[in-house]
Structures are given as C-alpha cells and as structure tokens.
Design a protein with these regions (language model features):
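Conserved alpha/beta enzyme-core scaffold
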Residues: 1-529
Length: 529
C-alpha cells in the first residue's frame, strides 16, 4: 500500500505490526486516546534501602525470563558501559528472545552482535543503530524486526502501551540508596536523563545503575525514588570523555564552514529572525558552526534568543554564558561543556516527552522558530534520509530529526551536494525518515533550495544575495559531477521499519544483497537459462 511519501508498504508488514501507512504529518491531529497506566507496587515501612548486590542478583529479583523487553538510554553515547554490562549477564544466564528498547544504540554496543546471532536478542526498537549492530541487522541476522523511532515517537510508543517495558535499566551518574537519580555530581556525568524518564514512569520494574552512591536525598532528582525498584552500584557506568564523538565535534572543514555561513545568512534574512526567536541546532559540524556565526550577528544586531533547545553543545551553552539567550531546554548533552552547563539555573532539563512527543497536548518542538539539521540524503521532494547509508546499511538514527522538522516554523537541512562520490541530493532517497512536507530549506555547498510549499520564504528571499537554486537543479549538478548512483540491491526480506513519529509506517528497510561482481552475475544468469 502506498503511503503519503509514495513508499509501498507491503501488506504482510501492516498485518504483522498492526500499523497503518503514513498519511501525512497532521493525520492524527486532535486524536484523543487513553494513556497506558504503569504497573507499580506499594512500599510501606521498608528497610530504607533498595540496594542490590550486583547485576545478576537484580535480574533474578526482577524475574528476568525469555521474551522480555528491556530498555536503556544513550546519554553516554559512545562512552556507554551499561548496555553491554547488563546484556552480558542476561546472555550468561541463558535468557533468549529479548527485545531491546533503547533510545539509541551506537558503536559502543558492537558486542551485542554476538547476542543477536545466538538468539539472545531477537528484536530491537531504537532511534537508530550504528556500527556492527546496523550491519548485522542489514545482513538479516536479527530474527525479528528492528523498529526505528524518533525520540518523540519512542515516548509515544511507551506511553500508549504499544511498547511495554518489563525492566528499565537506567545508568545514572549519581544515585542514593533509595533510587533518586541525577545526571550530574558523579565521576561519569552525562548532564540529564531525559530519554530515561518515560522508561522510569512506565516500565514494570526500574533498576538504577550507578558508580557514585551518594547520601539520601539526592535532590533535585532527575528521576524520582518513587519510580525506582532497585539500585545497583558498579565500578563504572560510562566514559564521559566519549560523549562528544564523530558528528558532535565542531568542524574545520572549509566546505562545511561555507554551508554553515549560507545557513546563517538564510536565518538572519528570514522573517523569523527577530528578538525573542527560538532555535535548535543538530549535532553535525556545519550545524554547530552555524550557531557560532549566528551568535556574532545576534550580538551585532542586539537580537536576543528567547530559548534554545537541544541536544545541546558548547556553542549553544556559550549563548547562555554570554547572556544572549534567556533559557536553554535540555534533553541531551553532546559535549562536556553542555554537561557542565546543566548546573546553570537558566539551563532546564525537560523530558523527551515534553520535547517531542506528538501524542501529548503540545511539545516544545511546536514552539520552535528554527531547527538546523543534517541528512545523509535529500530527494527532489525534500524527503530526508538520516538512517540508511547509500550502501543500504543501517548506519544512523532518526533522533529528533522528524520531530523538530515537523514542529519548527523553518526547518533547514544542511547536506553537502556529494557524500564522498555519492550524490546526497538525489531523485529518490534510499529510505525516507523525515517527509518532505516537514522540510523547508536545503543548504548545500553548491546552493540553497527552498521547498516550493514555502512561497512565503521564497518571497522573503527574493532580494537576498545567496546562491538559490531549485532542488532539481542541485540534483542535476550532483549527477553531472558524480553520475546518477546505482540503486542498492536489496533482498526480499524486510529487516526493519522506519516508523513515523505518529506510529504509522514511513518506510521499510530490507536485507541487503551481498555484493557481486558483474562477471559473477553474468555467469549466474547464463546458468539459469
């Protein structure tokens, strides 16, 4: 069945998942539903401690068994130790058929591939998967389905009861013996625990895992003792030095700096750039650079930002230090400067639900003026792909990309015309993660394209000295340089789905075919005749 972005979703997947095809961003606007209530228990006159000796013992007390769903957050990014620690113990206990519901999985979790291959892990729900896990899923090694959700979509799935978490494991930099968790004050600080809040509120059992036990009460708690069943103290939960990795670092690349300048010039010439505007930037190097250049213009023109949202990095936190923004609203910290900034009284932590859940009574993303994002591919319909590489491998994460693009008044995507020798601006993206109706502007190193849906922006920019082109012109330039890319050859088996933030199916991910040389293909064809 064709969905609103023209992707054919097989009936078998619709039946298997019980989901509908994506029918546009506003299909569920005004929809009313009853949230799933969490399971809890009465604790009256307990011994005053929830401490359990180790991971094995807490798994026993939680009643771990085959077929359960366990959850994790990714606030430590590539420095996370908790997922591997817990899953190794589950594996060693001989437990099978586990579903992992993680806010994201990265290269730090490569050891999970062994557990995918032996059936310990059979289903994965995540914002994205990088490294060897993505390769394993794309190669068909996961027995069940990988469901990729946005940050807001994940909260929706948990709160609605679509995803029922049996045990939530929350790595927390500090915790007291009664379960009050904070993202700061320890030796492995990550800043906030926003992605874990929905898990803590809705999981049947909640386990706090810390390497810094502090005296009661550990206030103000990011996650309250009223949600936590058990506390386990381990040697290390993560390496905060690895929070800022890869895309989360500032760039010195001249091409990316040029795109950042184009982006900034577009922002400051748009009708939304005025005193009291709101802003979020992605984690890409060009996006971070655009924030730095924007700060200079804000100072020159005496324009103040009302609030910044994130995923936060040092340049956004510098705006707070320099008193150029009133407040920051934080769901994740991408570097240690952002972690430190959490201590600022005008730096507020918010939950992932407050940030981006489309199935509540209004999330922060709906109040954004600008969001600056990145993409692996953008097609001529402005659809974006941020999850599947041009080789067909799962290699990225939806994150808040679809959420912020849908909510912001002006969603700007920065992408180089070519990713290596592969056109990033193309006729059709490999996989749709963010629909073109959400994307207003695409900034490349060869020019800027405004979505024809946004005639107001086209009119506002008619006298601005920037290299404007149509998206088709950008595609044609890319193809003239590198040629039209050959489509990736996929097998028939569907190994994953790209879920829209509203829970419908945006696209599917198929198993990739092993590479074959042309001569080998010819020989196979001749033998089959």
């Amino acid at each position: 069945m064709l969905n609103a972005v023209g992707r054919d979703i097989p009936e078998e997947i619709l039946k298997l998942t019980g989901k509908e095809v994506f029918q546009g961003n506003h299909h569920f606007d005004g929809y009313e539903y009853k949230k799933q209530g969490p399971k809890t228990k009465c604790v009256i006159n307990s011994n005053g401690s929830k401490l359990v000796e180790n991971i094995h013992e807490v798994l026993v007390q939680c009643g771990i068994k085959d077929g359960m769903t366990v959850s994790f957050h990714h606030h430590f990014r590539d420095g996370d130790y908790v997922v591997n620690m817990v899953m190794k113990e589950i594996h060693d206990m001989g437990i099978k058929d586990i579903t992992i519901c993680a806010s994201s999985l990265g290269k730090a979790h490569d050891p999970l591939v062994e557990y995918i291959e032996d059936g310990t892990i059979t289903n994965i729900q995540s914002s994205g998967v990088r490294g060897k896990i993505g390769e394993a899923i794309s190669q068909g090694k996961l027995k069940g389905l990988a469901i990729m959700r946005s940050h807001g979509g994940r909260v929706r799935a948990i709160e609605s009861g679509e995803t029922q978490i049996d045990i939530a494991f929350i790595g927390t930099p500090t915790c007291d013996e009664y379960g009050n968790c904070r993202g700061i004050g320890g030796k492995s600080d990550c800043g906030v625990l926003s992605y874990a809040m929905a898990d803590a509120y809705h999981a049947d059992k909640v386990v706090a895992i810390t390497d810094t036990l502090v005296p009661f009460p550990n206030f103000p708690a990011h996650i309250s003792m009223t949600k936590v069943d058990y506390v386990v103290v381990v040697d290390e939960i993560g390496n905060p030095q690895k929070i800022a990795t890869g895309a989360a670092k500032p760039t010195t690349d001249m091409r990316k700096l040029m795109m950042a300048d184009y982006c900034t010039q577009f922002v400051v010439n748009s009708p939304y750039f005025k005193d009291g505007f709101s802003y979020q930037t992605g984690v890409g190097g060009a996006s971070i650079a655009s924030t730095i250049s924007l700060a200079k213009i804000m100072k020159e023109r005496n324009i103040r930002m009302r609030f910044g949202v994130g995923g936060l990095t040092k340049p956004m936190c510098d705006l707070l230090i320099n008193d150029q923004v009133d407040v920051l609203l934080d769901t994740q910290d991408f570097d240690l400067a952002a972690v430190e900034s959490v201590k600022n009284l005008r730096h507020f932590r918010i939950s992932a639900g407050e940030y981006a859940n489309p199935f509540n009574k209004g999330a922060v993303v709906n109040k954004l003026d600008f969001v600056i994002l990145a993409a692996l591919e953008v097609d001529v319909n402005f659809n974006c792909n941020v999850v599947v590489g041009s080789d067909g491998m799962l290699t990225g994460a939806q994150g808040g990309h679809p959420d912020t693009a849908a909510g912001a008044k002006c969603a700007i995507v920065i992408a180089p015309l070519l990713q290596g020798r592969i056109p990033a601006i193309c006729t059709d993206v490999t996989t749709v993660t963010t629909p073109g109706e959400s994307v207003d502007v695409v900034v490349t190193d060869y020019g800027i394209a405004i979505n024809p849906r946004r005639q107001d922006l086209i009119e506002a920019m008619k006298d601005v000295d920037l290299p404007f082109k149509t998206i088709e012109e950008l595609r044609d330039i890319a193809y003239s340089i590198a040629g039209e890319p050959q489509k990736v050859e996929f097998g028939d088996r569907i190994v994953g789905i790209i879920e829209s933030r509203d829970g419908t199916i945006m696209d599917v991910v198929r198993e990739i075919k092993p590479f074959e040389f042309a001569e080998d293909k010819k020989q196979k064809k001749s033998k089959s005749k």
